[in-house]
Amino acid sequence: MFAAGLAPFYASNFSLWSAAYCSSAGPGGCSFALDPAAVKKPSFCIADILHAGVGEPGPAAEGLVGASAALTAHLGSVHPHASFQAAARSPLRPTPVVAPSEVPAGFPQRLSPLSAAYHQHLPQQPPTQQQQPQQQPPPPPRAGSLQPPTSGTRVVPHHSGSAPAPSSKDLKFGIDRILSAEFDPKVKEGNTLRDLTSLLTGGRPTGVHLAGLQPSAGQFFASLDPISEASAILSPLSSNPRNSVQHQFQDTFPGPYAVLTKDTMPQTYKRKRSWSRAVFSNLQRKGLEKRFEIQKYVTKPDRKQLAAMLGLTDAQVKVWFQNRRMKWRHSKEAQAQKDKDKEAGEKPSGGVPAEGEREERSPSRSEGEAESESSDSESLDMAPSDTERTEGTERSLHQTTVIKASAAGALITASSSASGSSFSFSSSSSLGSSNGSAGSASSLGSNCSELLPSHQPSVTSGPQSPEIAQVPLAGL
């Protein structure tokens, strides 16, 4: 088994040392027989391998030459179309092994066509049959079959039954089509629209084969063949140029250039919302608001129950409560800030009263002062106030001057008359001048009594008798 597995490896890939070194058995042992004298332990020295081609004498060279001759004879019997000559070719220049034309029916599937066990099952062909294909012209080839190679010819497999490959210009995304001006962004989409409309209306452009296209595009165009009304397709094109057929069917065309067109580029920048905003009815909103007043945070069982009652989903109720709590929190913070600002505005006005309060307090104060003054005046009727006292003083001063003058005149006139008349004049003048209150009269008398002695020297300075000076004092 080991020799059978390594024999094709050495024979096909390297051909430097033959597989005969693995075993000396015959054809039944999956190898070929050699001369016992030539059987030797293989030498892996590069010098021996190089000298083997030159043909120097020696046991190693003889063994390698014998092995090459045996390998040539063996491969020549198996492959009649290939000529192996040991003298002309060196083991350093391996000859390619060509697979046979026909495979036997009893050939196991796991064996390689180049293995030794595979070559043992092949029948020996007579030499007359080997030369017959060379003399007679070859028969016409069958579709899908491999032809046996001839000597000196190169095997070129080709499929005669397949359709001819479409040209690069006919393909939708061929090299010539891509490099042409149709993919220039400055060029309009007239050619693309013309090709698509011709395909959609049932007619195909010349040279385009659906079999040559990819299966996805072929199935797409084959399904659109029954459509024959071009007006239904071209009507949105005239109204909205961006709504083109290429924009509608951009995913159906294969290739990386399907999404790099001018119309499809802005489409990538637009963000599509994967969800739509839920619109609640008035009944649902009232039910949610009533539950929110009772309970700001709902548990999962309560949320499911509320959603079932209102005809909503669990996610909708959850999101509504989250948004409602956020709104409630913001309103609460705004109210607290408003109250704080109001308190801060009232604090500086608390120490100093406002103008309105000052005006309100001033009349009350004046009224209180008036009441107190009236009460004082009522309780002290006989006692004059400060103003009355000052007025009385001024009046007394004025009256004293008059009295002085009158007294002086009286005294002057009294100098020749009797003392009684002068006393009566002075008393009458004093009584006539005192028409005010009793306090003013008393103050007048006191003032007169105080002021008369000051004028006494002026009165008495003249040549008067001492009796005249004593008369007003005794009377007053």
UniProtKB/Swiss-Prot annotation:
It comes from Rattus norvegicus (Rat). This is H2.0-like homeobox protein. PROSITE patterns: HOMEOBOX_1, HOMEOBOX_2. Residues 369-379 have a biased composition (Acidic residues). Keywords: Differentiation, DNA-binding, Homeobox, Nucleus, Transcription, Transcription regulation. Residues 331-346, 355-368, 386-397 have a biased composition (Basic and acidic residues). It comes from the Eukaryota. It is found in: Nucleus. The keyword Lyase does not apply. Belongs to the H2.0 homeobox family. GO terms for biological process: animal organ development; cell population proliferation; embryonic digestive tract morphogenesis; enteric nervous system development; epithelial cell proliferation; liver development; negative regulation of T-helper 2 cell differentiation; organ growth.
